[in-house]
Amino acid sequence: MSSFIVTRRGLLRTGALSGLALAAPMHFVRGAYAEDKMSCNVPTGDTVTFGFNVPLSGPYADEGQDELKAYKLAVKHLNGEGDGGMLPTFSSKALKGNGILGKKVAFVSGDTQTKADAARDSAKRMVEKDGAVVITGGSSSAEAVAVQSLCQDLGVIFMTGLTHSNDTTGKDKKRYGFRHFFNAYMSGIGLGPVIGEAYGADRKAYHLTADYTWGWTQEESMKAATEKLGWQTVKTVRTPLGIGDYSQYITPVLNSGADVLILNHYGKDMINSLTQAVQFGLRDKQVNGKQFEIVVPLFSELMAQGAGEAIKGIYGTANWDWKLTDPGTKAFTQSFGKEYGTPPSQAAHTCYVQALLYADACERAGTFYAPEVIKALEGFDFDGLGNGPTLYRAEDHQCFKDILVVQGKEAPKDKFDLLEVRKIIPAKDVTYDAKIFGGDLGPADAKTC
């Protein structure tokens, strides 16, 4: 059996990741840096403050708690503590483990409550009262869009957390916002051919969709992908965020003529809707002479743990998985496991990477002055952070990298081994014209606060 055990001597890991050597901490010293240009909260003392804005309550709280763990680990590594994590595997060698530009990294955090208004208020407070020079985090696209707009107004860079709506780097994109996570359009491109091969071209789909920006664009992307296969969309139904009982939404599916249910839900909402759909017996039914199937376009190991047996055989997509074998993934999984006793989620991974990418951009720019940091991020090619070669595209601030098609394992080894990576979709196959989703990045003008 595969397990994570924390001891005084570090992480003892049985299975595929055993025997990995810990990277040595870095203790390079750099002289003090004098800023000659000012933007909001450019640090003048010996520390620089990050603002971690994550959902610690609400339906996406499990993701938020893992994000905060990852951010705290990133701060340790940036400050030269611990084993260095992904710093040694990162293709850029600007970060030396001595803070950023000679300043020690400090942080403040806030609870977004999985609500856009609360996320915006929390971010504003961290900028205006706590002096945060960057805001990062979140697990809802509604939060991301709201905070990104605020940060554009304040002149503070926002490194998004887990946000999957096409709108984040589409119609609602901002010069001060950057997304590492993939999007709904990419999920549709990756997942469509796989479920087409698995379930055939003659299918009728029923969508239950979280009623906010992510759900809307996920539904749109999955409709496009499945209708391209020849599937018929029977009905699309919007559901409120954070409800516990989905019976009133699942019951009509039974008599709709649909033979596939597509759940455009995330976090606890996905856990509840999927488990209840299975309890209603949907997966045991034959409809139109076919076995009824359920598809969850976006899910994670954390959600799989919550869904339990219901996740078996379910197809979806993911941004990253801790069982990948590249050096960056191995290093991060080892560090996170040593610190917390569990493997990291995709939410933890994308947030850890975003913290490193911002810090690295400051080092490469030689300043915290926001317009120069933005320039350092735009068009940046990098590798070694768990997703293979990656581009931070300048036109929309979207990262392009390989994505994963995953499926719930029928016979998992343990509660950490619930997903099987079925296919890796190359970055070139999910790359699209930046103009298709509209939007305008806006100016990079510096602002003081």
Residue ranges of predicted features:
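Solvent-exposed, acidic/polar segments of extracytosolic/periplasmic ligand-binding ectodomains
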Residues: D381-C449
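Short, solvent-exposed amphipathic alpha-helices that sit
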Residues: E63-S91, S187-G190, T213-L229, L357
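C-terminal segment of N-terminal export signals and the immediately downstream linker at the start
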Residues: M26-N53
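Extracellular/periplasmic ligand-binding modules, especially the Venus flytrap/periplasmic-binding
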Residues: G267-M270, W322-D381
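Short beta-strand segments enriched in small/hydrophobic residues
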Residues: T47-G64, L68, A205-L208
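N-terminal export signals
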Residues: S2-F4, G10-A32
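Beta-alpha junction/loop-to-helix N-cap segments that form part of ligand/metal-binding clefts
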Residues: E35-M38, D62-K69, G84-G170, H180, ...
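Extracytoplasmic ligand/sensor domains, especially the bilobed periplasmic-binding protein
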Residues: D117, K129-V237, R283-K285, K290-Y315
